[in-house]
Amino acid sequence: MEDASGSYPFGVATADGTPLQIDAENAAVRGINEWSWGSMSPGIPPAAFRPYSLPQFMDRPGPYPYQSSSSSSRELSGSAAKVAIPRTTSASSQSQRRRSARACEPCRQRKIKCDGSKPVCRQCIDHNVSCFFVDVKRVRDQKQLGLLGKKVEQYERLLQELEKEVDENAARRIRKVLRGTDISSPTDDGGDSDSSISSIGSLEALDLVEEDLNRSEKTVATGFFGKNSEVAWMQKLEDEAKSRNRKKEDSTDMEDGVAGGHTMTPPQKQETAMAAMSYYLDDIGIPLMDSVDPYALPPKDLANRFFTAFMDSVHPSFNVVRKTAFVSQYRQFFSQPAQPPQRWLAILNMIFAIGCRYTQATSGRPDSGDYNDLVYLNRARKLTLSENVIFEHADLQQIQVEFLVALYFVSKCQINRAFKFSSMAFRSAVSLGINLRFVDDRTQYPAKEARIRLWWSIFLLEHLLTAITGRVSCVGESLSATPLPIPYEEEAFGRPDVLPLLQDSSLRMTRLKLTLLQSDEESRADVSWLPSCEPSPSLYFHCIVDLATITQAIINKVYSIQGLRERASQVEQRIRRFSFNLDMWLSKVPEAYRFTSGSGDQLDLPSDRNAPWMRERISLAMSYYSSRLTLCRPCLTHTGLAPGDPSPDPAVPPSARQGSRRISSSRMQFNTAMALTCVRSARSLLCCIPETPDITWLTTMTPWWCILHYIMQATTTILLHLSSWPTRLPNDPMHQVSADIEATSRETKKALRWLHHMAYKYPAARRAFRQCNSIVRRITPSLGIDISDIPSGKDLPTEDDAYHLRDIDNTPSSRAGSMEFERHH
């Protein structure tokens, strides 16, 4: 027998075809060569003559391919009578693949071998079974943990959103859960405690009336002005200016104020009467001309001038009449004289009255003769607003008359009267369901669209009056189901790209959804669609309505009694959300109407004041910046404060002031950023008007019926900013909000020059200038601002007292008699 130690005696070939050799020095197989061949049983053939071969693929890979033989040799090591016999394999096993490290789920359930082939293994193919693989437990746990983590983040975001919508007890429980605190624990709410409810600057005393508004005819005519009104802001400025003067007289108190980091502390109680700070003209009576002929008309040329002035300057902002139909009726009326309905004549006379106001401003004609707007008002009054007609039920034309009367009073700065007639138009419209979707198949599409635009015109006017007066509004996004107006003119309703919006209500509700109610995805889709519409008055009307809904929501949610009862953190969350809505609206403004450049909201108007769509750009810009400063006004109180300083507002209790010291750095940064935005928005609004005052330009290029409101809103915001300025600015980065004093004072002087110029023509502007001029001259000396170039106002005409209402004698006896009469009548 040959020596078997030289080569493997079976001649087994490896995978590459070469004979498999065994290293004699390998300790793992050394036992094979050391066997005692002579001691074997004679009946067993020598190993070299075994007609067996090892399989090419083993079931279990190991450090040595002949594991079964080695195992057998170990078993025989204790008994020389046994020889290791390799396992017999069939020819088919030569091509069998080794078992997969991870079986598919069907093979694992049936407990059979799986080759691990993907996407389908061999066993599943043979058994016609759907093959799929499941991750190992460790991977499954990791994925499940990731999914649970994302769900927790979603739930936390949802709870944060719900926190500002629920009542205070539920909000407190939500905050404790988010902080990981036991909700049943009675512990304090930390730095965000209930004491910080009143910490938003201008929202204190929101639910209070600090004077008797029924004490005289003048106070009754003036009415109430709420916290979001610039009249209330002016009242606060007057009280602070008086406080500053008192400190100036008392040097000790003044030094204490400087040492405390503030220039003044507001008085503990309102000192100035509301009627004294209102620059509107509700205390001036409206003459009733009983001698006017309600059926008389101005000369045709003058009538055309008034009619065109209204249609060009006012109708794009208030689509109160269906333009194509009314223009056709107007032409027919003058070409073929007939007796139209009284309410149609009343609408025409109110259009003449408003157009006459526009013509007076642009032509400089005195308000006399056919240029007297009061004549047209009295004609409309006799036709539809007499004692008998007022008790009749209102139809669409009566709603239009009431609306136009309210708008006329706005242009006359008779805000309280406008508020009354606007409420009448609103109630009449709701009584006819104009605030709801109109789906009557018998009514033509243009007529349906006219009702939609009438409703949104009422909404716009009601919103404007709410912004001016600060009173509770009748309108809100939850009241109306009417879709946004279509951004196309009536002449384009038959086009293939426009007609589906009229025919498919679901498409219209999806495409023309309010920005206030849109999700992020819907807003981004709108950004690409709306700018594709061609510029037109209807597109402008669509944009201004969409913006007004956001601003009205700001007034309803922030400047509300509900907002007063909420925590400062909840109010701040609302401000963040509405700020995002305004950003989204700005991103959707079509290119023809854009008034900003880049991604920010910095004003960037064309240098050519006669550029196309310039009036629309300026009107949208003024409305946008007015919305911005209204939103951020509650944070303006913090501009003069260093981090950690207590709030200077008198309504804040000591416990709230202690809580304000615990305000986080992020909240202070938020307040500062919002205050900066408020001041910048006010300055941008004033930048919309040129440096040189021009009444004609102001009337033709701006919303002239409420331009005084915009100018005073921006001016009062800047004056509030200046009044909260410390006399010595600390070197603190948080005070960068007040760093540009030169630009701020420059815009203030510009506003005063405009008010002074307007004061020669408008009594309301005259009152506004005198109020602002008085406050500026009292607060600027301590700030080192030179006001020598501001007109003094001594050259202005005196107040016209011809129609002023007299004040009732405020003695106890007269008041007792007056109140006794009120109780019985």
UniProtKB/Swiss-Prot annotation:
Keywords: DNA-binding, Metal-binding, Nucleus, Transcription, Transcription regulation, Zinc
The keyword 4Fe-4S is annotated on this UniProt entry: no
One record GO biological process: DNA-templated transcription
Induction: Expression is down-regulated in the presence of ochratoxin A-inducing carbon sources such as sucrose, glucose and arabinose.
Sample GO molecular function, one term: DNA binding
Gene disruption: observed consequences: Leads to increased production of ochratoxin A (OTA) in the presence of OTA-inducing carbon sources such as sucrose, glucose and arabinose. Increases the amount of superoxide anion and H(2)O(2), as well as the sensitivity to H(2)O(2), in the presence of sucrose, glucose or arabinose.
InterPro entries linked: Trans_reg_galc, Transcription_factor_dom_fun, Zn2-C6_fun-type_DNA-bd_sf, Zn2Cys6_DnaBD
Disulfide bonds: none
Subcellular location: Nucleus
CDD domains: fungal_TF_MHR, GAL4
One GO cellular component term noted in the UniProt record for this chain: nucleus
Low complexity: bias regions: 68-79
Top-level division of the source organism's lineage: Eukaryota
DNA-binding region: 104-131
Biased composition (Basic and acidic residues): 239-251
Region (Disordered): 60-102, 239-267, 642-663, 804-825
Known function: Transcription factor that negatively regulates the biosynthesis of ochratoxin A (OTA), a mycotoxin composed of a chlorinated type I polyketide dihydroisocoumarin moiety linked to L-phenylalanine, and demonstrated to have nephrotoxic, immunotoxic, genotoxic, neurotoxic, and teratogenic properties. Also regulates cellular redox homeostasis and sensitivity to H(2)O(2). Carbon sources such as sucrose, glucose and arabinose repress gal4, leading to up-regulation of OTA biosynthetic genes and altered cellular redox homeostasis.
Xref: PANTHER family: ZN(II)2CYS6 TRANSCRIPTION FACTOR (EUROFUNG), ZN(II)2CYS6 TRANSCRIPTION FACTOR (EUROFUNG)-RELATED
Protein name as annotated: Transcription regulator galc
Gene of this entry: gal4
